[in-house]
């Protein structure tokens, strides 16, 4: 179903409003509470030596990053979203972390929408941005249009998000996912930047992770259940008298947890990079996911909340997350991220 610009902007405003509503959250369902990291009472290192720096490496180019934490995709394509993205991009610029932008779907049909990123880039010329398009749009769009999305953000990589539940529950949803695997494979060949496939809060099965191995993608962000549930978000956009409201209630806890999605990736023995997100709320959870094999870990809702408060709140949040990660590493005897990923720290 086609929608006007005003309808699109209202939908995106609804998404922000409802994503901040506790009813949209599957708190406590990411599975990470059941993981215990082994405490090291006598770490052979100085806390000041703990190093959380990393990089984004592709085709011989290495982009330095201050930490493995990335800002997970939330919103784009409307005035409030622009303000949020400007604040997040400034943080990415200042602190050298990756930032996933919200869906760039609108830019496929509205060339003026790309101006949002030109304004963002003026404020944050060194922001490390990750472009973002949905699989349903990728399937139907010529590759030159997708490349324009990448160019508009000057993205270092492109997320392709998979969101079947959200699309099925969205009145304006696009639910034709046929030939999606072939579309991803074609994109990998022609995009010119790394392609990372992500879910949007419902996670991945072993089978899907194995199927993606044939496409040549750079990585997968498992984006499991445990945080903002976009099925719930779409349900709460509907009136209680609407059928879709009640259908969404049926699927309010649908999905594979973040922890289980990571375990599924281990079982699938994938060779592409594993990133993780989905209900991540603190640096200890980031450490747990790194120990499970994640090379980057995304945080969404906390960054959205902080962005609405301003730059100082964003700085405080990121500093806290990074400090919690460092404490996790110190107390497991991990000098750097490689140590954390390679040690048997899971009990």
Swiss-Prot record:
It is an enzyme of class 5 (isomerase). Residues 8-20 have a biased composition (Basic and acidic residues). Keywords: Cytoplasm, Flavoprotein, FMN, Isomerase, Isoprene biosynthesis, Magnesium, Metal-binding, NADP. GO terms for biological process: isoprenoid biosynthetic process. Mg(2+) binds at residue 167. Transmembrane segments: none annotated. Its cofactor is FMN; NADPH; Mg(2+). FMN binds at residues 72-75, 103, 132, 198, 223, 228, 279-281, 300-301. One of its GO terms (cellular component) is cytoplasm. Residues 1-31 are annotated as: Disordered. It is found in: Cytoplasm. It catalyses: isopentenyl diphosphate = dimethylallyl diphosphate. Its main location: cytoplasm. Gene3D superfamilies: Aldolase class I. Substrate binds at residues 11-12, 103-105, 166. InterPro entries: Aldolase_TIM (IPR013785), FMN-dep_DH (IPR000262), IPdP_isomerase (IPR011179). Pfam families: FMN_dh. It comes from the Bacteria. SUPFAM superfamilies: FMN-linked oxidoreductases. Its EC number is 5.3.3.2. One of its GO terms (molecular function) is magnesium ion binding. Belongs to the IPP isomerase type 2 family. NCBIfam families: IPP_isom_2. Homooctamer. Dimer of tetramers. Involved in the biosynthesis of isoprenoids. Catalyzes the 1,3-allylic rearrangement of the homoallylic substrate isopentenyl (IPP) to its allylic isomer, dimethylallyl diphosphate (DMAPP). This is Isopentenyl-diphosphate delta-isomerase.
């Amino acid at each position: 179903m086609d929608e006007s610009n005003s309808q699109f902007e209202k939908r995106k405003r609804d998404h922000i409003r409802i994503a901040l509503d506790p009813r949209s959250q599957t708190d406590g369902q990411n599975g990470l509470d059941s993981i215990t990291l082994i405490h090291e009472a006598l770490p052979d290192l100085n806390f000041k030596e703990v190093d959380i720096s990393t990089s984004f490496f592709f085709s011989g180019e290495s982009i330095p990053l201050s930490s493995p934490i990335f800002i997970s995709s939330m919103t784009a394509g409307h005035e409030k979203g622009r303000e949020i993205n400007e604040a997040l991009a400034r943080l990415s610029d200042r602190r050298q972390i990756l930032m996933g932008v919200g869906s760039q779907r609108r830019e496929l049909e509205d060339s003026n929408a790309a101006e949002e990123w030109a304004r963002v880039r003026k404020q944050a010329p060194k922001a490390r941005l990750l472009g973002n398009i949905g699989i349903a749009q990728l399937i139907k769009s010529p590759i030159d249009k997708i490349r324009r999305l990448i160019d508009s953000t000057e993205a270092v990589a492109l997320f392709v998000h998979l969101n079947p539940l959200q699309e099925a529950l969205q009145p304006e949803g696009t639910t034709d996912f046929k030939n999606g695997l072939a579309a991803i494979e074609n994109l990998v060949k022609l995009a010119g930047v790394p392609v990372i496939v992500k879910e949007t809060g419902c996670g991945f099965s072993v089978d899907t992770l194995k199927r993606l191995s044939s496409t040549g993608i750079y990585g997968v962000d498992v984006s499991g259940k445990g945080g903002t549930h976009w099925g719930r978000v779409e349900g709460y956009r509907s009136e209680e008298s609407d059928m879709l409201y009640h259908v969404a209630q049926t699927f309010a806890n649908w999905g594979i947890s973040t922890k289980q999605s990571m375990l599924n990736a281990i079982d699938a023995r994938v060779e592409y990079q594993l990133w993780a997100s989905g209900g991540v709320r603190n640096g200890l959870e980031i450490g747990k996911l790194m120990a499970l094999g994640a090379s980057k870990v995304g945080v969404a809702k906390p960054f959205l909340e902080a962005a609405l408060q301003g730059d100082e709140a964003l700085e405080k949040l990121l500093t806290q997350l990074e400090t919690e990660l460092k404490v996790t590493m110190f107390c497991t005897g991990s000098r750097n991220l490689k140590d954390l990923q390679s040690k048997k720290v899971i009990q």
